[in-house]
């Protein structure tokens, strides 16, 4: 009988923990700062500071064992670390791990949070993601409806469950990580790097950096931009006019930039949000679709 009562108590405790809810908010005095509040085991913890910068959001280091005395963080994944994507560093909050949905879009993997980087405004219902102790997993509801935050591990996107949607309704440019072959004076140059498309006017692309970039610019006398201020990093870039792309440097059977085109199995980013999969670019409508 005692064991049955203990079992019921444990189940009830788990149900209470399953109601854990995180909230992200700002204060009037500090508009650039964000905070998290969370009720844990009946105790509401406020003002867990998140700092924000060009790289996005991350939790400032706290003594989590002091904040959550009923939980052990010795073996949990509450560590803030830095990753590098496209030569930019982004801070990863490795607190949530698992699978979640935004509308019809399903992501699997770690979550990192970037400011205003994803054109979804939705409440994310996250299940079995947060490991507050060595043995307990809680169900957490995250409501970022006002903040427009993004969460995706670029190496763990389940592209089979992605529906087509317009991602340039908010942002006019995209960075795509692709290998590109350029024909110039009878030679072929394989440039492996990142390509930035400005689709609002479809006039320029920049391609940077690559194994052969310096040599390519030296021999072809293509203009090389020495410093490009992208908040987090400076890099070298080639800048082309669209006519040159269509006629000389990018023949149609490589990148038909004057027409709509698709890019398969590529990485892409839109203002910091990273995607892996297929892109379809409609230059007439100035739209880009992620398939």
What are these regions (language model features)?
Residues 19-291:
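Pepsin/retropepsin-fold aspartyl endopeptidases
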Residues 1-22:
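Bacterial Sec-dependent N-terminal signal peptides
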């Amino acid at each position: 009988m005692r064991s049955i009562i203990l079992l019921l108590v444990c189940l009830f405790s788990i149900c209470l923990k399953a109601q854990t809810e995180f909230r992200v908010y700002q204060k009037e005095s500090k508009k650039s700062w964000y905070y998290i509040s969370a009720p844990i085991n009946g105790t509401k913890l406020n003002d867990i500071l998140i700092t924000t910068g060009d790289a996005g959001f991350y939790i400032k280091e706290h003594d989590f064992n002091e904040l959550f005395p009923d939980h052990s963080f010795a073996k949990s994944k509450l560590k803030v670390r830095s990753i590098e994507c496209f030569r930019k560093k982004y801070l990863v909050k490795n607190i949530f791990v698992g699978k979640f949905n935004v509308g019809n879009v399903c992501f699997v993997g770690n979550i990192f949070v970037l400011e205003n980087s994803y054109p979804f405004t939705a409440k994310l219902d996250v299940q079995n993601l947060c490991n507050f102790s060595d043995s307990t997993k809680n169900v957490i509801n995250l409501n970022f409806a006002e903040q427009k935050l993004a969460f995706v591990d670029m190496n763990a996107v389940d592209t089979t469950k992605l529906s087509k949607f317009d991602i340039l309704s908010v942002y006019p440019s995209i960075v795509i990580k692709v290998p590109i072959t350029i024909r110039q004076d009878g030679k072929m140059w394989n440039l492996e790097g990142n390509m930035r498309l400005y689709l609002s006017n479809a006039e320029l692309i920049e391609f940077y950096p690559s194994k052969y970039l310096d040599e390519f610019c030296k021999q072809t006398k293509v203009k090389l931009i020495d410093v490009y201020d992208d908040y987090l990093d400076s890099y070298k870039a080639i800048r082309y006019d669209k006519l040159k792309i269509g006629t000389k440097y990018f023949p149609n059977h490589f990148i038909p930039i004057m027409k709509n085109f698709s890019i398969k199995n590529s990485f892409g980013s839109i203002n910091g949000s990273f995607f892996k999969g297929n892109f379809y670019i409609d230059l007439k409508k100035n739209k880009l679709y992620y398939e």
